[in-house]
């Protein structure tokens, strides 16, 4: 493959799967001798992006306002000035702005790639994500979603490339890891105890299933299990009212002394190591189940609702943890079973991150001729 210049577009570089994938592909491009450009409003992951050797150009292309159209000429000039070969849009508004910019470039226009990271509600606005010359779907669930809701999409343009995990970043931990548990309990005393530690990572939104996790904990403790629950990420800025609801529910259930509702942690490998059972209880089907891969890499069992990309990933990696959505009795039974007889983790975890990077660069190669 000749050296390419690839620009990735996304709203910002704060946190999340879209941002993480952007950094991972920037790293792969630079490693392979290509030029990696990223356009966004910036954010706390900017230093990590620049550490990959990628170049960042600051434009607020995620602001949902007609004012954002003023960035179209700037993007067009950028694509021409940098002799961009491929424009890769990772969310809807940046994709629309890129489409408008490319329309004015004629035969000199770069190839257009999109990645569908989520299961957005079908609409004309969302349809832009299915309009790339190549459309990367992060799971078979996403591919089916695209073909069902945008039937004019040519299936030959779709490429399924699951998100990946670097096993070196999520090293296998002993079962059970007393040192990791002690470190977590020192920071969050409610998590101290000899019973199971349940972990539900995720943002402070109702869709992440925090209520289901609290109810599961209450039922397990009623069964005589000294279980504890840690929900890192639920205490989001601006989500004080939601956190207050969760705290009220915990008190009502009589489990407030066994729950830690905290801000996100940057030490997720250590969080997995400290836990005995990882929960993925999103109320709405999600595009992919990266948490499943991360937890299995560390050697922890996962319990989740069997729908969307999470169900797809669980069935592939640990089918014992896939439970009929919203069946609280089945969830409780599966939790006890996974703790009593945790499934053996893979002897070695494949480098699914490198596989994702290689597959994405192969898509770029398809369009570079």
Map each language-model feature to its residues.
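A conserved, positively charged/aromatic
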Residues: 103-140, 151-152
């Amino acid at each position: 493959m000749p050296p390419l210049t690839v620009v990735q577009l996304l709203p910002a570089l704060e946190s999340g799967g879209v941002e993480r994938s952007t950094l991972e592909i920037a790293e792969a491009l630079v490693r392979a001798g290509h030029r990696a450009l990223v356009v966004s409003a910036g954010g706390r992951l900017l230093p990590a992006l620049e550490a990959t050797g990628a170049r960042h150009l600051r434009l607020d292309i995620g602001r949902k306002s007609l004012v954002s159209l003023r960035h179209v000429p700037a993007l067009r000039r950028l694509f021409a000035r940098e002799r961009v070969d491929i424009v890769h849009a990772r969310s809807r508004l940046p994709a629309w702005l890129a489409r408008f910019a490319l329309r004015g470039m004629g035969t000199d226009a770069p190839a257009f790639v999109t990645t569908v990271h989520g299961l957005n509600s079908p609409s004309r606005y969302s349809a832009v994500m299915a309009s790339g010359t190549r459309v990367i779907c992060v799971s078979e669930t996403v591919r089916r979603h695209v073909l069902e809701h945008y039937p004019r999409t040519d299936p030959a343009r779709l490429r399924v490339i699951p998100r990946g995990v670097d096993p070196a970043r999520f090293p296998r931990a002993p079962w059970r890891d007393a040192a990791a548990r002690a470190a977590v309990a020192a920071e969050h005393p409610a998590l101290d105890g000899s019973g199971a530690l349940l972990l539900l990572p995720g943002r402070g939104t109702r869709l992440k299933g925090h209520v289901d996790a609290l109810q599961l904990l209450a039922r397990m403790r009623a069964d005589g299990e000294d279980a504890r629950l840690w929900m890192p990420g639920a205490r989001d800025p601006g989500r004080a009212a939601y956190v207050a609801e969760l705290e009220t529910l915990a008190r009502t259930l009589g489990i407030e002394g066994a729950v830690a509702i905290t801000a996100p942690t940057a030490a997720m490998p250590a969080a997995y190591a400290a836990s005995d059972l990882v929960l993925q209880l999103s109320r709405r089907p999600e595009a992919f189940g990266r948490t499943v891969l991360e937890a299995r890499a560390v050697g922890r069992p996962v319990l989740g609702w069997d729908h969307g990309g999470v169900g797809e990933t669980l069935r592939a990696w640990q089918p014992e943890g896939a439970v009929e959505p919203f069946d609280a009795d089945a969830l409780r039974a599966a939790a006890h079973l996974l703790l009593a007889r945790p499934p053996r983790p893979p002897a070695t975890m494949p480098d699914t991150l490198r596989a994702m990077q290689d597959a994405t660069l192969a898509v770029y190669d398809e369009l570079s001729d």
